[in-house]
C-alpha cells in the first residue's frame, strides 16, 4: 500500500487508468456482483439486448454510487469506518428487494397461466354452444389460435422477436430497479483507492480511478446480461421445444433469485449480529 501511495503522490497513477479498467473487468468475474441473478432475470423475462445493457449499466451505476457514498460518509461520520461495517446492512436491504422481485416474477407467471386457462375455458364453452346451433365447420377455424399455454412474452416472440412484450411486460423502471439493487454491495478495493486519493487531496484522480474501475466492471456485467439475452434468442430459433421449457423457466428463475436473496439476507443478518 505504501508503494501505491507514493505513486499517487507523484501523479504517476494516470498511467494505471487502463489497468484500473482491466482490474474492474476481472473483478466482475469474481463471485458476487449478481451476475447469476441478472442472467436468470434476463432469461426469465426473455429480455432484449437493449434491456440487458440497461440492466448491466444500472448495476454498475449503483455499485459506483455506493463506493462514493461510503467513502465520503465514512470520512464524515468516523475515522474508524470501514466498508465491512456497512456491507451487512446493504446485503440485508438488497435481500429484501431481491426476494420481493423473485416473488413478483413467480406471481406474474402464475397469474398469466391462470388468465390463459380461464380464457380457454370461456372459449371452449362458447364454441360448444355454437356447435349445437350450427353443425357446419366453423369451429375448425379457431383451433390453431389456442395451443398450449404461452405467456405474454412467448406469444409475442412467435409473432415478432422484437415485439415479444405486451402490456404485462417488465417495464424499464423495474429492470432499472433490479439492476440498481444488484449493484448495492460495495467493493472494498475501490473504496480503499478512493479514500487514499481523498486523503491525499487528489479527488479528481480518485474519481477517475473509480470510474475506470467501474467501467471495467460494467463491461463484464453488460457482457453477461447481453450473453443471456442472445442465448435466449438463438436457442428459440434453433430448438422448437424452447417455448415449452421457457414457460417453466420463470418459476425456476424466481426460485434461484429468491435463494440468492435468502443467502444475502442470512449473511447480512449474521454480519449485523456480530
UniProtKB/Swiss-Prot annotation:
One of its GO terms (molecular function) is nickel cation transmembrane transporter activity. The lineage of its organism: Bacteria, Pseudomonadati, Pseudomonadota, Gammaproteobacteria, Enterobacterales. Keywords: Cell inner membrane, Cell membrane, Cobalt, Cobalt transport, Ion transport, Membrane, Nickel, Nickel transport, Transmembrane, Transmembrane helix, Transport. Residues 34-56, 108-174, 231-251 are cytoplasmic. InterPro entries: Ni/Co_transpt_high_affinity (IPR011541), NiCoT_RcnA (IPR051224). One of its GO terms (biological process) is response to nickel cation. The keyword Signal does not apply. Residues 127-137 have a biased composition (Basic and acidic residues). This is Nickel/cobalt efflux system RcnA. Induction: By nickel and cobalt. Transcriptionally repressed by RcnR. Residues 1-12, 78-86, 196-209, 273-274 are periplasmic. The chain crosses the membrane at residues 13-33, 57-77, 87-107, 175-195, 210-230, 252-272. Residues 127-153 are annotated as: Disordered. Belongs to the NiCoT transporter (TC 2.A.52) family. RcnA subfamily. It is found in: Cell inner membrane. Efflux system for nickel and cobalt. It comes from the Bacteria. It is a multi-pass membrane protein. PANTHER family: NICKEL/COBALT EFFLUX SYSTEM RCNA, NICKEL_COBALT EFFLUX SYSTEM RCNA. GO terms for cellular component: plasma membrane.
